[in-house]
Amino acid sequence: AFESAWRLSRIHDRHELHELLREDPELCLERRSAPERLFFSLRMQAFARNAIGSLHEAMESIAIDSCTFRSPEIVLILGESYNKHHAALYGYPLPTTPRLSQEEAAGRLYPFTDVVSPANFTVQAFASQDRQTAWCDTPLFPALFRRAGYDTLMFDNQTTFTLENDDVWDQEIRHFLYHPRLSPQLFTHCNADKYPFDEGLLADFDRQDLRFRNPHRLTIFHLMGQHVAYRNRFPAEAGYFTADSIPEYSTSGLRRSRDERRIVADYDNAVRYND
């Protein structure tokens, strides 16, 4: 217990913190006692303040010489908890991605098949073997588009812009991405509401569409996607699979109970709804 606090106390900057968490990713899980939790929180708040300051400086330093706007309308969709092994697009036997598969067949979609990530956790996935730079030392990409003359529209279903929501990931996203010092550098518009299902973002987009006359736009949709609990990620009428749709034995030969197959069916329904 006290070893964790001592190790954290020896860290002087976020680079050392990243190295420590890379070496010992379970470190933060060891803070069981109230004093440990308080100490950890205070240290993390200090590092967060430094990270926000670094991000602000990095984005202030952006210089765009010119932009041809060869792609005037760009849409980026960020999914969540998406496992390609449950996507028919990548060979899954159930029809979880009928629309994506149709787009691929028509030659309008290119599925990547050889992508390697250093981690399955968002921030750690930014790590680069060739460039030992902390993620907060370089500009976030929406700021580049904004500085180049694009309107940057953000429709996010993982956070709200009020203080009533106490979800941990909601607070983390709001603390960095929508920090009052950083958000104006990143986005022309952010949605104000959160929706039970991701299609609510599309209705929100339709309501806002006429407000922005700039022909050059980057629109980002950040979905709740297939985040747990899976049964909450699709409306009842969108249910397509049931426990009976899922094989009793997994591809690795493990027998699945009916409850386990129902959970898999819920996930597959979330994938299909996401599609």
What label would you give each PLM region?
Residues 75, 269-275:
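Metal-dependent active-site segment of extracytoplasmic phospho-/sulfohydrolases and closely related
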Residues 5-251:
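Active-site-proximal alpha/beta segments of enzymes that process anionic O-linked groups
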Residues 243-266:
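Conserved small/aromatic sequence motifs within transmembrane helices
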Residues 186-194, 258-271:
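Surface-exposed cleft-lining segments at the edges of enzyme active sites
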